[in-house]
Every structure is written in C-alpha cells, then in structure tokens.
C-alpha cells in the first residue's frame, strides 16, 4: 500500500496558493454533464503507456496525446503528475482484489490466492513497485481506495484463522514483503532475458572465471547441480514453483511459531 497522508487541520487541506490538497478521491470530478474522460480512463491510459515504454514515459503531455486532447485540458480532471500517479496506483490495486466467488473458504488457501493474484499484478506491471511504492514514489501519495479494499480482503479471510489480530498483521506484513521481494527478483530476471545476448554471455563467462579461481567452493558445488545450471536460473517455471513453496513455508512456519508460543 502507498504511504498515507494524515493532515492535522482543515488548513492543511489547502496549499499556500489555495490549491486543494485533499486526496484526489475526495475532490469532485469535473462538473460538466458530459465530461470527455473519466479518471479511470486517464489512469488506464497512463498504465498502458508505462507497460509499453516504462514509467519514465508517463507524463501529462504523453497521456493527453494518447487521449486525443491537450495537456491543459487534462488539468481539468487532475491537478498534476502526483494525482496521475495516485490514480495509477489505485488502478493497479484494483487488480489485486480477488472476486468473492474465487476465494477459497479455507483461510490459508485464501491468503495464498490473494498473494498469487497480487504477485501476478506486479509481474504484469514490472515498473510499478519501484515507481509507485519505492523510494522514488511521491511522499504525499495517499493510500488509495482500492488499496484499502485489498487490505480489507486480506483481513477478512483471516477472521476464521486461530491467529489473534497482532499475529494476523504480522503474517500479512511477512507475506506482503515476500510478494514484493519475489516480484522484484522476477522483474530483474525478465530484464536480464531482454538484455543483449552478448552482454548476458559476457556476464556468464565472468562468473565461470570466478568459479574456476577456486575461491568460491560452495558456489562451485551449486553450479554443478541441476538447480544451479544457467538454464534453471533463468527458468520462469522454476521461479513460480519457488514462490509457491516459499509462501507455504512462510504461512505454515508462522502458524507453528504462534502455536508454540502459547
């Protein structure tokens, strides 16, 4: 979830120039009877641009061009780039919400189902974690409505678990961090696959040269095993299996720890 903003007074809701600093979802959409665009449409276009060309390509001018309008007219709908980023974040978080009829009744399986779906969103949009949730994200980006829906769903499936609220929150934090780390790693692997083959080959040869030095005996032993072969390292299916296995170990291990602590 994005970082929240908690203004302390009504005065904090307006900037020095009188601009409305409330989150975009608290500001009314354009009052025209037939606005040309909705905020959802603007967000969808911005996400599509990021998917095709990377987050760096997302700009008010570019989104306006894709919508067939002028940059100035876009400011009728949103105040600027930070609003655009907030809408993009909300659009992606909407994708993480699992339809109720697809949620298993068993709470563990429900947690896994939500985790799989969330990971899938980040894999489809590999730019999102760094751009919307990393250190480059605007510090004032509020927690979006769909991020609240995602968190609410995670808490709802844990109601039938034997965990108390503190343990539930800890489990969700661990699972969410695992999803984030695994998605970032998968994004790096995808980037590597799309790199110039000559550069990949040069990097592999450098690694083999280090192994031949004899200074890394444990890594050398790993490289001789099927799990350490170059093809396996870049295998997407292997990554999927690793995610499933790691997620199960996290949930089962956490529940075992809670039981032992009682």
Label the model's feature ranges.
Residues 1-36, 217-233:
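N-terminal intrinsically disordered/low-complexity leader segments
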Residues 165-230, 241-249:
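Hydrophobic alpha-helical segments that form the core
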Residues 235-261:
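A hydrophobic membrane-anchoring alpha-helix module
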Residues 41, 62, 83, 113, ...:
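Amphipathic alpha-helical interaction segments
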Residues 89-95:
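Short, basic, alpha-helical segments at the C-terminal edge of helix-turn-helix-like DNA-binding modules
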Residues 98-140, 146-149, 175:
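Hydrophobic alpha-helical connector segments
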Residues 41, 45, 49, 53-83, ...:
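Helix-turn-helix
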Residues 113, 136-162, 166-173, 183-184, ...:
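Amphipathic alpha-helical packing segments from all-alpha helical-bundle domains
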């Amino acid at each position: 979830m994005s970082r929240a903003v908690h203004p302390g007074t009504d005065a904090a809701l307006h900037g020095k120039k009188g601009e409305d600093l409330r989150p975009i979802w608290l500001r009314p959409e354009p009052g025209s009877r037939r606005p040309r665009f909705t905020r959802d449409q603007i967000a969808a276009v911005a996400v599509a641009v990021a998917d095709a060309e990377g987050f760096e390509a997302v700009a008010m001018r570019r989104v306006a061009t894709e919508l067939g309008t002028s940059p100035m007219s876009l400011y009728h709908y949103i105040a600027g780039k930070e609003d655009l980023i907030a809408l993009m974040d909300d659009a992606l978080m909407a994708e993480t919400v699992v339809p109720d009829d697809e949620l298993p009744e068993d709470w563990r399986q429900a947690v896994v189902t939500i985790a799989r779906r969330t990971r899938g969103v980040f894999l489809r949009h590999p730019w999102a974690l760094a751009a919307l949730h990393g250190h480059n994200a605007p510090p004032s980006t509020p927690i979006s409505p769909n991020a609240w829906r995602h968190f609410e769903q995670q808490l709802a499936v844990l109601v039938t678990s034997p965990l108390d609220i503190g343990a539930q929150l800890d489990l969700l934090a661990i699972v969410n961090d695992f999803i984030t780390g695994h998605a970032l790693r998968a994004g790096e692997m995808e980037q590597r696959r799309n790199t110039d083959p000559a550069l990949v080959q040069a990097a592999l040869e450098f690694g083999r040269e280090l192994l031949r030095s004899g200074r890394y005996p444990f890594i050398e032993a790993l490289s001789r095993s099927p799990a350490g072969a170059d093809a396996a390292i870049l295998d997407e299916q292997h990554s999927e299996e690793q995610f499933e296995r790691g997620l199960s170990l996290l949930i089962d291990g956490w529940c075992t720890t809670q039981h032992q602590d009682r």
